[in-house]
Amino acid sequence: MKTRFRHLALAQVFASLLITAFADVQPQQQELNGARVNVSAMELEVSTGVISRKWKWTGAGWATTSLRDLVSKREYAKETGLACDWRLPGKLDDKSVGELADCVIRESDDDGFSSKHLEVVSTVNYPKVGMAIQHVVWVYPGAPGVRTQVRVKALPGYDAKGAVPHDEQYKYCGGKLFRPGARTDFLPLDLSKPNSRRYWGIYNDPGNRLDQSKPMLEEKIITGFPVFQPEVIAWASGEVVEYGDVGVIVVKESAKAVNQPAHLTGGFFSGQQGVEVTGWGLAPEEIVPDRFRECWATWSIVYGGGNDGMQMALKKFDAARYPVFPERDAFILSNTWGPANPGGMRYTAEETVMKEIPALAEIGVEVLQIDDGWQKAGDGHCAKNFLPKYKNGWKDIKALADKHGIRLGLWVAIRNADLNDLKKNIDELGFVSWKADFDYLANRGDYEARIANYRTILKHAWMKTQFTLCPEYDAPRYGWYFAKEYGSIYFQNIQEAEPPHLTFVPYHVLRQHWFMAKYFPSNKLQVMLQNPKRTRKDFSDASRHGHGYCFAMGIPFVPCFFQLAQYLDDDGKKELKPLISAYKKDRADIFTSTTFPIGDEPSNASWTGFQMVSTQTAGTGHLLLFREMHNAQPKGSVQLKFLAGKTLSLTNLLTGEKSTVAVSAYGKAEFEISTPADYRLLRYEAQ
C-alpha cells in the first residue's frame, strides 16, 4: 500500500509540474480557410482539412500523439515512451524540464514568400541547460502536410560543451553503428505493421552527371517488417513509409544532396519507436543569446493512391510551401554561355548582345540573360564589381531590348556581390533574372546571410526580379528542398562541344529531366536547351534530332534557350517559332500544372514523356510524348496518371488537330508518332 501511495504522490507532483509549466498559456483557437489550430488542455492540435497532427505537453516538450489522414480517416501515430519531438544529446532529452512560456498563433505568408498559412510558435525555456526552443508549425489550408521547425536560443548559463549535434558513428563488436544526433522531428509511426520504406534524394553537381550511368535521382526501397534495429539513411532528403497504397512522407527542408550533406543535415533513423529526423543545421557553438536561430524544417505529409498519389501529395505540399509566381517566373530565358567552348565570356561583348536581342525576339524568347563577363572586373569565382562594363552602361542595350520586348537577366558570383550594385542594375533595367553562381555555404551564418540578401533584393523590386540558384560543382549550397521561394534551381550546364563530358546528348538530357520530374516540381527547375545542329558528332547524336524535339524537352520546366539565336539556321527558326508560339498560348496552364514522368525511362529507344495535370481545371492537362530515335514502334502504350477508364479529347497544340483516345481501366492509352525522334504536345480533357 505504501508503494501505491508513493506512486500516486509522485504522479500528483508530476501533474502539478506539468500544469505549472503550462499555466501561462491560455486556451486558444484560430481558423483560416478550413485550416485550424487549437491549444487547450495541454494539447496542441493543427488541421489543414486534409491532415491533422496533435501533440501533448509532457513537461519536457511537445510530443506527437496523433497523425491523421482526414480523408481516409486513418490514424498513423502510435503510443511511444518519448516525451519530446526534439532532442540535443548532451543537453536536451526526455528527462529535461521545460517551461512552456507562450504559444502564439498568427496568420502568415512569410512576407509574401510562401502561401498563406497559420503559424504556431511555442516557446519552451530550459533554464537548467540555458536554452530556449521555439517549436514552429506551419498549417496550410487544404494541404496534405504540415511543416515543423525548431528554433534555438541561448539563455544565461548556456555552455556548448558536451552537446552532440551530429549523428555519431561508433564501433561495436566489429560493426559500425550510428547514434542519432540532434533531432528536429519525430513521427511515432508503427513499423511493426506491414510496410516498406522508400528513400529518395537528388544529387548535387548536376553538370557532372550527364551520362547514362549517373542518374540525378537516387531511390531505394527497403522491405521487411517489423523493423527491429534502427534503419539509418544519411543520404536521402525524403522517406516514405508505405502501408500498401497509403502512407506518410517525411521530407527534410534542408540543403542536403545525396553526394553533399551540407551543414549538419542529419539523416533518417527508422525503428521500433517510429521515424526520427536528425540534423538541426545548427552547431552548439552557433547557438547565441541575442536571437532564435532556425534549424532545418521537416514536412510530414499523408497520401493515398500508391506512388502516383504519393508524388501528387508531395508536389501539392511543395507548391504550398514554395508557390510559383507566373508574372515573375514564367518565361523563356536564353543564356549567352550556351555556345561556350569551353569559356563563354566573349559572348557578353556588346556587339554580340545587340545582335542577339532581335534574333531572340524573332523566335519568341523573352529574356536574354548575360552570363559571366558583363561585370566590370574578374571572372568566375573571382568576379566582382557587378556593374555593366559597356560603354554607355545599360542605356543602349536597354533601349534595344525595350524596342523588341526583351527583358534581361544577369549572372552573378553571389558571394562577391554588393547589394547596392544589384539594386542599381534592377532599377536601371526594370527587371532582372539572376543566375546566382559560385556559392559556398559552410555554416548557419552563411545561410542566414545569403537568405537575408535574397529577401532584401526581392523586396526591393517585388515581382521584378528573381534568382535561379546554381548547384553546379560539389560545394555545399542549397540542395533541392530549400530556398526555392526566390525563383528556381539551375540544372545542368550542357555544351555544344567543349568540354567533351558536357556535350549535349538528347536522350541523356531527356532522361535526367524525366528523373527530376518524379519528386521535384518542374516549374522550379530551369533546364538548358542546346542547339542540336551545332553539337559535335563524335560524342553525340544530337544532329539527328530536330530543334523542336530538343526544345520540347524543356516545356514542362523553366526552359532556358542555352544557345545563341543568331546562330540558328532558317530551318531552326521555322521549327522553333511555331512551337514556342503554341507553348505560350497554353503556358499559363502548363506552368502551374503538376508534372509527372510517364512512359518508359528514356533510353534512346523508348516511348516516354511527361503528363502535366492542370491545377486550374479538373480533368484537364497536357501530354508531352517522345518516340526516341531508336524506337521501332510507331504506336506506343503509355501509362497515364489519374485517368483510368476515361476517354480523352486531345488537341495537338502545333497542328490544331483533334482526336480522342480511350484510357484502359488500368490507366494505359495508345498513341501514334509515325517517325522516330519526334514528339507530340497535346492538350487533353477527360470525359
What residue spans do the PLM features occupy?
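Hydrophobic, well-ordered secondary-structure scaffolds
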Residues: 418-484
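Polysaccharide-binding surfaces and accessory modules of carbohydrate-active proteins
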Residues: 24-46, 51, 63-267, 651-660
